[in-house]
From Swiss-Prot:
Gene: dcl1
Location of region: Disordered: 1-62
The keyword Zinc belongs to this UniProt entry's keyword annotation: yes
Protein name, as recorded: Dicer-like protein 1
The protein's enzyme class: hydrolase
Enzyme Commission identifier(s): 3.1.26.-, 3.6.4.-
Entry's Gene Ontology cellular component terms: cytoplasm; nucleus
Any one biological process term the GO annotation gives: siRNA processing
Helicase C-terminal domain segment(s): 431-601
Residues annotated for ATP binding in this entry: L129, D130, T131, G132, S133, G134, K135, T136
Length: 1519
């Protein structure tokens, strides 16, 4: 992928990736299975159906810190304290259930319950009791007993164990947890899938197990915990199975028993207690089903032996049969005909058409027409429209096609039609069916008078319940207050999707009497705490014994009625009545006739049979944790692993199974998502396709475990291993952390110090102003003990900020000075320090590191004799006289153009300009001159003496001497930068008398140049230090680039557009641009090296190994090892430290202590790492001996310090590469044809056609068909090559742009959006080999859109910015893989990559201004820049995770900005994308008026890494 590389920093610093959110909002964990129910089919609660959703939609790379916060947030929602007066509508589900539980919530046992409890204490038991008879209390009693025993065992030192209360729906989780909390004094936790429990790790589970004695959860949660070895059977003391009749086939109840319970020794098994109203829920042999249930649960059915006592507690209702006349055949109403004629072709309305037609017979025309009113109501219409668009988008079409917009428009028209259609009168003939009329009649009789009747009407379909509710609302039966209770279903097409909260609120209203007639589906049959009714009506007849028993159990009120509605002369209905009655009698007889000891013959054999049926399924057990992998669970484990590879906006990371017939059997190949290190596996042959699929999944899981990509709990390690590597790049701090030794001066100055030099080497220094200077500056020659290199030119700023180029010319011939010559040279050099800089040194030529002398004025060349270059006349003049003494009879013109200085005050140095005949020494100074203490006369103004000395001098001085105009020399020494405003404001015009001052023997032109010498020698010294750094690394880099790479001119140099902190003036260019270039070359060089040295590695290993090489931590460690920190220039010009060291100072301020105090500098670790990359960039700009990248290659080897990259030249890459077998194999006809076609399009001829075949082979393509590797390795290489060619182009074209601008515009050139459009433009998309129907659809639609946009754009080269994003996992990768293939095929000629760039990419980017806004102003991008650049914080992340609706509503997504483990802000939305935007926007608002210091104080931001290790940290995927 182009810029989702593992080494690219995302918004995290423990930087985690910004993880995607599961689109599946249903509860539970996935077993890899699932089914789809049409919205108008039989009612089935979807509360636990979510357990069977594919978990590949789930994200499993959550940061541990965020996960804890997310869990806490969800728990807070569910368990938040309830205010006494808080409205019911504001309560959470737990609070609603807790507040409105029937009775007080304190249960008292009855005799038969105690009897069953005693039995359950000593043996595994299935309690078969009627609904309402108190099975839950027996479970509570048993739990109390088990907890008491457990506490005793723990006190005796036994390992702790806990109890599990397993239920089959999410609503029951809430309800049973509330009951247990009201009856147990121990901690009770409740969990279900939508709480994100499938994302928890062992540590999280261990914490819950440790602090809770009982856990109420849906069964699949425990099943997965057992399979993942988060808990073992030995750690469980009791398993309670609510509604135990579900234990059959592959239900999680059955899987827990088969996969975990029966596989441990009997002595280690927990007690089992099952509860059900009937042990069977299917048609067929009742006794056989009961025995099977006993075998599956390893338990014995038990019921009370005192049924008379039970009858006293559970009132059996009076059973009635309501007979209605035979229904009419289905027909079509007028509204139906009208709707069908105009909108019958809209597939989304098909369920409504089907139900409306069926309802004409079952319910009548009023109800049939009413479904349209409900389905197309104003409040439902937006949901319908969203469902249409969402369904189309879920098929991978991306943007909505025109036909979807058309359907939405027509749906609105249909709604308007229904609204305008005159409603029928429900009392009219044929308006209601005979069945509904009977219901109306009977209910009217029950509610016609003042009564306390409570009624539940059971229907099979959701629509039926809703329409009957609407009907009885319209009929306005006296005393009737109707309501509707249906199951949770997120995919209902007509907006009838209800939430857990709505369910609970409806039951609360029913309990309080606000509703007294519920029209309900099967959701009201089982488990829910619904108060006793005195009328239960089966509008749609039950079909199984369990439905009959459970719905009858709702009629528990005294003198209640249970009515079954049957059609007159309907043999099927009459048969069901007989069958259910017979089955109940048989079941009762079975229970009553069981022997007292409840021993069933053949139980052991039955248990063995359960295991024998899965004998082929030998589990793979991990010894360290006892986690088990079975063939059945392998599919779930594999799906969970695949989902851990998914990132935001990626296509779904799903597992692909390819089943092929082989020798009268089936063999399955499993193909893992593209990002998986292991591509897949092939299973053993099997006679059934489903078995072959399990075999392949099992082998793939074993292979993943072998490569340690599944941990010891069978969870993906990606959420730990990959982000740790992704974060390596940012695993060091950007801020000041340590003090490092700094090299104050080049070691060249110390060579041969202490001896009189026998030979010296000269370097001529001349100045070339860009505009004329106000005064002449003479040339100088610098003699040193060692030869100086050729220095680059550099600017200084003289006079009134005139930019002046410093030219240096090294003289090849050495100078062997005589003793006299050396004496003259020493005298002049020391005179400069005294007169110009007020430092008087002892005359010790053996200690001088250099000699600064005047040069002759004619141009000098390198071959000149240095003796001829020196102006010996000036040296002689200076040597002969200390100063030019002022004489009263001196001609005034001799005083002009002199350098004069105040011997007593170093602030006053002047260049004399002219004599003013109009002024006298006694005249007051002109008003424009700078203010001094004595302004009465010019003579007094010119003196710096003390009071007494001043009086003496004034009494004897010459008051008739001339007055001169002079230029005051600014104290400014840092001529490497322009003047500051303060310096510019200094008044330099002055008037002086000469007598109080000293006239230097140094000519004014030479003195002027000497004033610039501190800046010049400082810059030359910096170049020499850069040269030393390069020599230490074995590099030959241009001094200009070497110094630039080592220059850090502020504390936050890397923050390109932020205000620079502690800015050092005049240091020249800093390292930031070179670091940008070097970073890119480092990525390319290490990619090539790894590709060549490890041809068999997969893309994952390449990314991880490259990250280990190029991460800042590795660069930092390597730099510290080589002591590169001492060469970094972090300080600008110093007026105190430029003087030569070691000389004996006789007069003047001593700066030696200052030099000692600046022996160290504070550097951030990241700065040191950045300098390494900048040195690579500098080496890259220095031509190599054979290839222009040679020096860059050598620099990479020097800074990464690893055997993974030890190349010394570009040629070494070629010698490292061993051609793989597939590349050399003879191509077949299709491969030759592919090369020919691609050559016609792109112009490159492949020597190895199979390389091109590999470049166009998608990872989804089965290896059995491909015969070449997929493109991942070539794409890894091509991605780095493309980055390099784009960066190099921008770097050279825009020399003044900062790295942030370069990065933003490079993003356009290498973006998936552009590369996808380019692939289509070049026609590459037609050559891709893949095996994915989703990809086929995505490529087709994207190509059509891209081609249309290109054809309509005329000459606009940025047309691609207006298209949708391309399929990310193929088209952009194709371009990069093609570049990688060309590079390898051409024997590593980078020039071929440049040719492709010039021909096919650069034409789109000649005018980069077009893309100024491409890096859009996204809140998350801005937040990232603000935190890193403005605040300098690196320890932050943006995380998002799904949480269950606080009250069972649709799941929401919570995003949080975390700074140093503090939740800065959060955002909640329906999707991860918008939640992150909200959180980012809130964070930007929060930080709006906070400066850097306040931020660091408030969030304790120091960004200091406690250690450099990256352990098993679950950090996530960067922004």
């Amino acid at each position: 992928m182009t810029h989702q590389n593992t080494e690219t920093a995302s918004l995290a610093t423990t930087k985690g990736a910004l993880e995607p959110l599961p689109p599946d909002k249903t509860a539970g964990l996935s077993t890899g299975a699932g089914h789809e129910i049409s919205s108008d089919e039989s009612e089935g609660s979807e509360e636990e159906t979510g357990l069977h959703k594919d978990p590949s939609q789930r994200q499993r790379q959550q940061n541990a810190t965020f996960q804890a916060f997310l869990s806490h947030h969800a728990e807070t929602i569910v368990n938040s304290p309830v205010k006494p007066n808080q409205a019911q509508s504001e309560l959470s589900i737990s609070s609603l259930i807790g507040r409105n539980a029937s009775g007080t919530g304190i249960l008292n046992p009855r005799e038969y319950q105690i009897e069953l409890f005693e039995r359950a204490k000593v043996q595994n038991t299935i309690a078969v009791l009627d609904t309402g008879s108190g099975k839950t209390l027996i479970a509570v009693l048993l739990l109390k007993h088990v907890i008491q025993t457990e506490l005793i065992d723990r006190a005796n030192g036994n390992p702790p164990r806990i109890s599990f209360f397993l239920v089959d729906s999410v609503t029951l989780v809430y309800q049973q947890a509330s009951v247990l909390r009201n009856n147990l004094d121990q901690n009770v936790a409740h969990f279900f899938g939508a709480m994100g429990v499938d994302l928890w790790n062992k540590q999280t589970w261990a914490e819950h197990f440790e602090k809770n004695m009982v856990i109420v959860c849906t069964a699949e949660i425990l099943n997965q915990c057992l399979l993942n070895a988060y808990i073992t059977m030995q750690q469980i003391n009791l398993l309670v199975f609510d509604e135990a009749h579900h234990t059959k086939k592959d239900h999680p109840y059955a899987r827990i028993i088969r996969d975990s319970y029966l596989r441990v020794p009997p002595s280690s098994r927990p007690r089992i207690f099952g509860m059900t109203a009937s042990p069977v829920d299917t048609k067929g042999d009742v006794l056989e089903a009961a025995r099977n249930l006993e075998a599956l649960l390893d338990s014995k059915i038990a019921t009370t032996s005192k049924l008379t006592i039970l009858r006293q507690v559970v009132n059996r209702p009076n059973e009635e049969v309501w007979i209605y006349d035979k229904l009419q055949p289905t027909f079509t109403s007028d509204l139906y005909k009208l709707m069908e004629s105009r909108f019958g072709d809209i597939s989304h309305l098909e369920p409504m058409f089907r139900f409306a037609r069926h309802a004409t017979s079952e319910l009548g025309t009023w109800c049939a027409d009413r479904v349209w009113v409900s389905a197309l109501a104003d409040d439902v219409l937006p949901k319908v429209e969203g469902s249409i668009g969402g369904k189309r988008q879920s098929t991978g079409l991306g943007q909505l096609p025109k036909d979807v917009h058309r359907d939405i428009t027509r749906i609105k028209e249909a709604s308007e039609l229904v609204e305008s259609h005159p409603p029928n009168d429900p009392g009219a003939p044929e308006a209601l069916s005979s069945k509904v009329r009977v219901l109306w009649k009977e209910i009217s009789q029950c509610f016609g008078q003042e009564t306390n009747t409570k009624c539940i009407v059971f229907t099979e379909k959701r629509y039926t319940a809703k329409v009957l509710f609407d009907l009885f609302t319209v009929l306005n039966v006296p005393g009737l207050r109707p309501g509707v209770l249906i199951g949770v279903r997120s995919s209902d097409r007509i907006g009838m999707n209800v939430t857990f909260r709505q369910q609970i609120l409806t039951m609360v209203r029913f309990r309080t009497g606000e509703i007294n007639c519920l029209f309900a589906t099967a959701v009201a049959e089982e488990g829910l705490d619904i108060p006793d009714c005195n009328l239960v009506v089966r509008f749609d007849l039950y079909k199984t014994l369990i439905q009959y028993v459970q719905s009858r159990g709702r009629a528990r009120h005294a003198d209640s009625t249970y009515a079954s509605m049957i059609e007159k002369d309907n043999a099927d209905h009459e048969s069901i009545l007989v069958q259910v009655n017979d089955a109940e009698k048989i079941m009762q007889s079975f229970c009553q006739l069981l022997p007292e000891d409840r021993i069933l013959h053949g139980n052991d054999d039955d248990t063995d049979a359960v295991l024998d049926r899965e004998e082929w399924e030998e589990p793979y057990t991990l010894p360290s944790t006892a986690a088990r992998l079975t063939h059945h669970s392998a599919i779930t484990v594999l799906a969970r692993y695949a989902s851990s590879l998914q990132y935001e906006n990626d296509t779904s990371a799903q597992v692909t199974y390819v089943v092929l017939p082989v020798n009268d059997a089936y063999v399955c190949e499993v193909i893992l998502p593209e990002k998986s290190p292991i591509r897949g596996a092939t299973g053993m042959p099997a006679m059934k396709k489903s078995t072959a699929k399990r075999y392949a999944a099992f082998e793939a899981c074993r292979l993943l475990r072998k490569h340690r990509l599944l941990d010891e709990y069978l969870n993906s390690v990606y959420h730990r291993r990959l982000p740790a590597m992704r974060n390596a790049r940012l695993a060091i701090t950007s801020h000041r952390t340590n003090e490092y030794k700094i090299l104050p001066k080049s070691s060249l100055w110390n060579k041969q110090i202490g001896v009189i030099p026998g030979k010296l080497y000269g370097t001529v220094i001349s100045l070339k102003p860009l505009t004329p200077l106000a005064r002449e500056h003479g040339s100088m020659i610098l003699f040193t003990r060692d030869r100086l290199p050729q220095f680059p030119t550099f600017p200084i700023f003289l006079g009134e900020d005139v930019e002046t180029i410093v030219l240096t010319v090294p003289v090849n011939m050495e100078l062997q000075p005589s003793a006299d010559e050396l004496d003259y040279m020493t005298t002049f050099t020391l005179r400069i320090f005294r007169d110009v800089f007020r430092k008087t040194y002892d005359k010790e030529p053996e200690k001088l590191p250099y000699w600064l002398l005047p040069a002759i004025s004619f141009p000098c060349n390198q071959e000149a004799d240095p003796r001829d270059v020196v102006n010996w006349e000036i040296l002689s003049s200076v040597h002969e006289r200390d100063d030019i003494e002022y004489q009263a009879d001196m001609p005034p013109e001799m005083l002009v153009d002199r350098f004069v200085y105040d011997h007593w005050d170093g602030r006053y140095r002047y260049f004399t300009l002219a004599v003013d005949e109009n002024l006298q020494p006694s005249s007051p100074p002109p008003s424009h001159v700078a203010r001094r203490r004595h302004m009465d006369t010019i003579m007094n103004y010119s003196i710096s003496l003390s009071k007494n000395s001043r009086a003496k001098f004034l009494s004897r001085c010459n008051w008739n001497q001339p007055v001169l105009h002079a230029e005051l020399v600014r104290l400014r020494r840092n001529l490497l930068d322009r003047m500051t405003d303060k310096e510019r404001k200094l008044e330099t015009r002055s008037v002086i008398c000469i007598e109080p001052l000293k006239i230097s023997a140094i000519p004014a032109a030479i003195a002027a140049t000497c004033l610039a010498f501190p800046a010049i020698i400082s810059r030359l010294d910096a170049y020499l230090i850069g040269l030393e750094a390069c020599k230490k690394l074995g590099l030959e880099i241009s001094l200009e680039y070497a110094l630039e790479a080592l220059t850090k001119d502020s504390d936050n140099t890397h923050e390109h557009r932020s205000q620079q902190v502690h800015m050092q003036r005049g240091m020249g260019k800093n390292y930031e641009r070179l670091e940008f270039l070097g970073d890119c070359f480092l990525k390319m060089a290490t990619s090539i090296s790894l590709f060549n040295q490890h041809p068999d590695d997969n893309e994952f290993d390449y990314h991880v190994n490259r990250m280990c090489l190029i991460c800042n931590r590795n660069l930092f460690n390597s730099a510290v090892k080589k002591e590169l920190y001492q060469f970094i220039r972090s300080r600008g010009f110093s007026r105190d430290t430029w003087y030569p060291e070691g000389l004996t100072l006789l007069q003047g301020r001593d700066h030696s202590k200052k030099i000692g105090s600046e022996s160290k500098h504070a550097l951030a670790e990241k700065t040191i790492a950045d300098v390494c990359e900048a040195l690579i960039g500098a080496a890259l700009l220095t031509p190599g001996p054979q290839h222009r990248f040679d020096m860059g290659v050598r620099a990479v080897s020097a800074v990464v310090d690893s055997n993974e990259h030890n190349a010394a030249s570009w040629r070494d890459y070629i010698s490292l590469y061993s051609i793989p077998k597939y590349q050399e194999q003879a191509p077949d006809g299709s491969e030759i044809d592919l090369c020919r076609r691609v050559e016609e399009k792109l112009g490159y001829h492949f020597r190895y056609p199979r390389l091109l075949h590999s470049a166009f082979t998608h990872p989804s393509y089965p290896s059995a068909w491909a015969r070449v590797p997929c493109y991942q390795s070539l794409e890894f290489l091509g991605d780095a090559l493309l980055d390099m060619v784009c960066v190099e182009d921008l770097f050279r074209r825009f020399p003044d742009r900062d790295p942030q601008w370069l990065t933003e515009h490079k993003m356009a050139m290498v973006s998936n959006k552009f590369l996808g459009a380019l692939a289509v433009k070049l026609g590459l998309h037609t050559h891709l080999s893949y095996f994915s129907s989703a990809l086929q659809s995505q490529i087709t639609h994207y190509a059509e859109e891209a081609q249309a946009a290109a054809s309509q754009s005329d000459v606009a080269v940025d047309y691609w910015t207006l298209t949708q994003d391309p399929p990310k996992v193929c088209l952009p990768d194709m371009v990069e893989a093609y570049l990688g293939a060309v590079f390898v095929d051409s024997n590593f000629r980078f020039e071929e990559v440049e040719v492709f760039f010039q021909q096919h990419i650069k034409p789109y980017f000649h005018d980069m201004a077009i893309y100024d806004t491409f890096a859009n102003r996204h809140p998350t991008t801005f937040l990232h820049n603000k935190l890193t650049n403005e605040y300098g914080c690196l320890n932050y992340c943006l995380k998002a995770g799904e949480i269950p609706g606080a009250d069972g509503d649709a799941s929401t997504v919570l995003a949080a900005v975390i700074v140093h483990d503090t939740i800065l802000t959060t955002g909640v939305a329906s999707s991860g994308r918008y939640a992150k935007v909200k959180a980012s926007e809130n964070a930007l608002t929060e930080l709006l008026h906070i400066d850097r210091n306040e931020f660091r104080k408030r969030y304790q931001c120091d960004c200091v890494q406690e250690n450099g290790e990256h352990g098993e940290r679950d950090v996530g995927t960067p922004i």
